[in-house]
Amino acid sequence: LFARGVARRYALWRSGRPQARFDRPLLRLRGLLVEVFGGRRQLRDPLAGSAHLLILYGFCAELVATSLISIQDWSGVHFLEGRFYLGYSLFADLFGIAGLIGVGMAAWRRAFLRPAHLHTVFDDWLALALLGLVFAQGFAIEGVRIAVTELEAQPGLALWSPGGYAVAVLLRPLPDATLLLLHRTLWWVHALTAFGFIGYVAYGKLEHIAYGLANVFTRNLA
């Protein structure tokens, strides 16, 4: 679905007149990083901008964290160990918490503050729900794992994952067999949610994740 959506948008772009929009790639990349991660435009509205940046940083950090796990599993090279693993765990959890806070701020703004210029439709709530689910499911899976493998056997290690640790404390009274079944179930639910999220990005409210980056990179530098 994602590839199909991107292909359709690319065909639309190709229908226009050709222009040089890939020249000076380093300048374009620098502008992209400043615009996206600096949040200059978004922070004109402090609450909306802060929520956007928290979600962005949280999402990017979780993407990096998940990618590192995948690289380790596929390569067979175990580099998530020792102090690096502790830092990695803390980094992933803190940014995941930041992402959840950002989703909460955005939802609060739409549900209760309701600025006059802000028009909320179903797609807005769907986007926030998907983002919140992706973050929350990650903590749920981590919490189940910690409850089984670290909470009692390695409590010092578990503390480096504060979000997962909080979930683990709540779940620890459950039998190990129940926790293992819950872990497998949550893993598949999370995988389906993540793939659904990726497909949704090409069509829904979050399409700016893909197309906004392309638009900023290929902006007119004249």
Language-model segment annotations:
Residues 1-222:
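Membrane-embedded alpha-helical bundles of multi-pass integral membrane proteins
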